[in-house]
């Protein structure tokens, strides 16, 4: 079982080492995240490894995808096999076809670079992608128009339900069974 570093966003700034100790005591052995402020990737990886925590996935900002080699370097240093982008810039709640089209182009080109370097690129949804489009949603558009060889997905169950309804996670898993590589599940 793993945890997203964002879950501990209020703890890490106080003490990275104490936060990792808490994560270890919880029995968690995988962390999705990257080096915290004041630590290099090498130092952060060692702190995690010393506690039996691996880092299978790390994040990348949307703007970084135009030149993904720095994200490749960070991921390799951390030992991550997945790099996840969690946000497509858009205005307010108005996520448009044009936003989705730009993302598809960027995801395909960056995803190719990640694949060439032995890393799987994933996009993490946040609910705004579920605006109606043709016979589905803009999320369908993104999935259908990204190259499966280069782009995979990380479903956030809560955000998928928020944007698409209570049955949307199951629908998407059935509709695109081979595209989902990672999943966020929130416990309320």
What are these regions (language model features)?
Residues 1-26, 79, 134-151, 155-188:
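Histidine-acidic metal/acid-base catalytic patches
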Residues 18, 43, 99-102, 171:
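An acidic, carboxylate-rich microenvironment
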Residues 35, 87, 187:
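Short secondary-structure boundary segments
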Residues 43-50, 106-116, 172:
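Catalytic-core regions built around general acid/base machinery
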């Amino acid at each position: 079982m793993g945890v997203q570093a964002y879950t501990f966003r209020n703890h890490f700034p106080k003490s990275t080492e104490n936060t990792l100790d808490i994560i270890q005591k919880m029995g968690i052995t995988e962390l999705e995240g990257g080096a915290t402020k004041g630590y290099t990737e090498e130092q952060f990886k060692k702190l995690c490894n010393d506690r039996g925590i691996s880092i299978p996935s790390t994040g990348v900002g949307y703007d970084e995808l135009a030149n993904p080699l720095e994200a490749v370097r960070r991921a390799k240093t951390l030992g991550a096999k997945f790099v996840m982008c969690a946000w497509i810039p858009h205005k307010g709640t108005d996520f448009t076809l044009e936003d989705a089209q730009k993302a598809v182009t960027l995801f395909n080109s960056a995803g190719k670079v990640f694949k060439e370097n032995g890393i799987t690129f994933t996009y993490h949804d946040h609910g705004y992608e579920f605006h109606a489009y043709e016979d589905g949603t803009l999320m369908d558009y993104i999935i259908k128009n990204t190259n499966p060889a280069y782009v995979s997905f990380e479903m956030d169950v809560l955000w998928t339900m928020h944007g698409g309804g209570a049955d949307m996670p199951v629908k998407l898993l059935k509709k695109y069974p081979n595209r989902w590589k990672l999943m966020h599940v929130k416990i309320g």
